[in-house]
From Swiss-Prot:
One GO MF term attached to the UniProt entry: ATP binding
Gene3D superfamilies: 2-enoyl-CoA Hydratase, Chain A, domain 1
Zinc-finger ranges (C4-type): 226-248
Xref: InterPro entries: AcCoA_carboxyl_beta (IPR034733), Acetyl_CoA_COase_Trfase_b_su (IPR000438), ClpP/crotonase-like_dom_sf (IPR029045), COA_CT_N (IPR011762)
Protein name: Acetyl-coenzyme A carboxylase carboxyl transferase subunit beta, chloroplastic
Keyword Plastid: yes
Top enzyme category: transferase
Superkingdom classification of source: Eukaryota
PANTHER family, alphabetized: ACETYL-COENZYME A CARBOXYLASE CARBOXYL TRANSFERASE SUBUNIT BETA, CHLOROPLASTIC
Reaction catalyzed: N(6)-carboxybiotinyl-L-lysyl-[protein] + acetyl-CoA = N(6)-biotinyl-L-lysyl-[protein] + malonyl-CoA
HAMAP family assigned to the protein according to its UniProt record, in alphabetical order: AcetylCoA_CT_beta
Quaternary structure (record): Acetyl-CoA carboxylase is a heterohexamer composed of biotin carboxyl carrier protein, biotin carboxylase and 2 subunits each of ACCase subunit alpha and ACCase plastid-coded subunit beta (accD).
GO biological process, alphabetically ordered: fatty acid biosynthetic process; malonyl-CoA biosynthetic process
């Protein structure tokens, strides 16, 4: 038995590399190993399986799948398939998703018995009942690569109960990744749902009760689910994509640290007031959790001391002062520490004549600090007035999703240039609060960046991947230039 380890998300190129298949899939030769084995391939030298030709190259000829044994109840395991190559040799193909094993066996005695039983099965009049037979037996139209991809897709659907989506269609797998969506259409966990798939002309019905939260929790180390289209993004590459959904282009939330890394040149970030923490000024107590305990919990969870990071750095060589709010820390709520850190940042920039960027992501004033949190609105606005009106310096406000409450009512809307991210939720009061207060229905989409842009609420809507270049041009337009010309990108 020869075993190949494989990942549950495969492209054709990855499959070809792992199994010794070449890109020339029009004609496949005898199944076997490539002459140069990888470390992750386990070779059983006792098996006499043909190599890829005399030269050790990967040139191929046709492989004919005999049947998928799902059509024969109880014959062999549901994840085993029988194929035949151009030399007439038969092989059984076995998939084990849980243990990530791909096995090929050419035990002739076993396979002869298997084929004999299969022939008997077919002669008993079951040809028409077996959906795999009519389409695949001795049919060179479907290549080995297409067949294996379809088998993996069908196995993924049934084994781990996910809805697979093949980008290039159900009949042509030659250029497609197998993208797996865990409950891609949001299904109520209390309802019984059915997935209906077409497998080579037959309908495969899978019924079960799905629990979205359990599934997301199970696979969250691999995937990030889009809030807009519910598609899955591979977590390993998600950060390099700037947290933008590959399926629909939706901008998902980013941590403050990721935003700093996105905007600030490498090695130039110098944080300010990192040791400043809240002391629970009004001794707010909740039946559920003490305010201090909640602060400590978020500090451990996020690695931050408060809901904003402030500091100085360079953006394409231009010295700037920047504050970035983090929605992951108590919803980015603005308390006395957040207000103090932003005020000190603006005052520092005023004294050094630096441009200021503040990235807003907040639910508003922090209720656990009462009127002290509301006071921060006036304090920051006062510092901003001196910076902008008296010193004539340049302040850019960037509104991300969500920006609401006291932040919207103060420094969020005070920028000389106000930039919004696509699809950002921007409001003073939330939809539910407005509807309950005024007894009026708030239209869907009336608090999104695109709608508010047409109402003149801010200046441009800038996608994340273009933001750094736009900011650099704005600063140079307003007289802030790189420390050296080589820094311009």
């Amino acid at each position: 038995m020869e075993k190949w380890w494989f990942n549950s998300m495969l492209s054709n190129e990855e499959l070809e590399h792992a199994c010794g298949l070449s890109k020339s899939m029009e004609s496949l030769g005898p199944i076997g190993n490539t002459s140069g084995g990888e470390d992750h391939i386990i070779n059983n030298m006792d098996k006499n399986i043909h190599s890829w030709g005399d030269s050790g190259s990967s040139s191929c000829s046709n492989v004919y799948p005999l049947f998928g044994v799902r059509g024969i109840q109880g014959f062999i395991s549901d994840d085993t398939f029988l194929v035949r190559d151009s030399n007439g040799d038969s092989y059984s193909i076995y998939f084990d998703i849980e243990n990530k094993i791909f096995e090929i066996d050419n035990d002739h005695s076993f396979l002869s018995e298997l084929e004999s039983s299969f022939s008997s099965y077919q002669n008993n009049g079951s040809n028409s009942d077996n959906p795999y037979y009519d389409r695949y037996i001795y049919d060179t139209k479907y290549s080995w690569n297409n067949y294996i991809n379809s088998c993996i897709d069908s196995y993924l659907r049934s084994e781990i109960r996910i809805d697979s989506y093949i980008l290039s269609g159900s009949d042509n797998y030659s250029d497609s990744y197998i993208y797996s969506y865990i409950c891609s259409e949001c299904v109520n966990s209390s309802e019984s749902s059915s997935i209906k798939t077409s497998t080579n002309g037959s309908d495969l019905n899978i019924r079960g009760r799905y629990n979205d939260l359990d599934l997301n929790k199970k696979y969250r180390h691999l995937w990030v689910q889009c809030e807009n289209c519910y598609g899955l993004n591979y977590k390993k590459f998600f950060r390099s994509k700037m947290n933008i959904c590959e399926q629909c282009g939706y901008h998902l939330k980013m941590s403050s640290s990721d935003r700093i890394e996105l905007s600030i040149d490498t090695g130039t970030w110098d944080p300010m007031d990192e040791d400043m923490v809240s002391m629970d000024p009004i001794e707010f107590h909740s039946e559920e959790e003490l305010y201090k305990d909640r602060i400590n919990s978020y500090q451990r969870k996020t690695g931050l001391t408060e809901a904003v990071q402030t500091g100085i750095g360079q953006l394409n060589g231009i010295p700037i002062a920047i504050g970035v709010m983090d929605f992951q820390f108590m919803g980015g709520s603005m308390g006395s520490v957040v207000g103090e850190k932003i005020t000190r940042l603006i005052e520092y920039a005023t004294n050094r004549s630096l441009p200021v960027i503040i990235v807003c992501a907040s639910g508003g004033a922090r209720m656990q600090e009462g009127s002290l949190s509301l006071m921060q609105m006036a304090k920051i606005s006062s510092a901003s007035y001196n910076y902008q009106s008296n010193k004539k310096l340049f302040y850019v406000s960037i509104l991300t999703s969500p920006t609401t409450g006291g932040v919207t009512a103060s420094f969020g809307m005070l920028g000389d240039i106000i930039i919004a991210e696509p699809n950002a939720y921007i409001a003073f009061a939330g939809k539910r609060v407005i509807e309950q207060t005024l007894n009026k229905t708030v239209p869907d989409g009336s608090q999104t960046a695109e709608y508010l842009f047409h109402k003149g609420l801010f200046d441009p809507i800038v996608p994340r991947n273009l933001l750094k270049g736009v900011l650099s041009e704005l600063f140079q337009l307003h007289g802030f230039f790189p420390l050296n010309s080589n820094s311009i990108k």
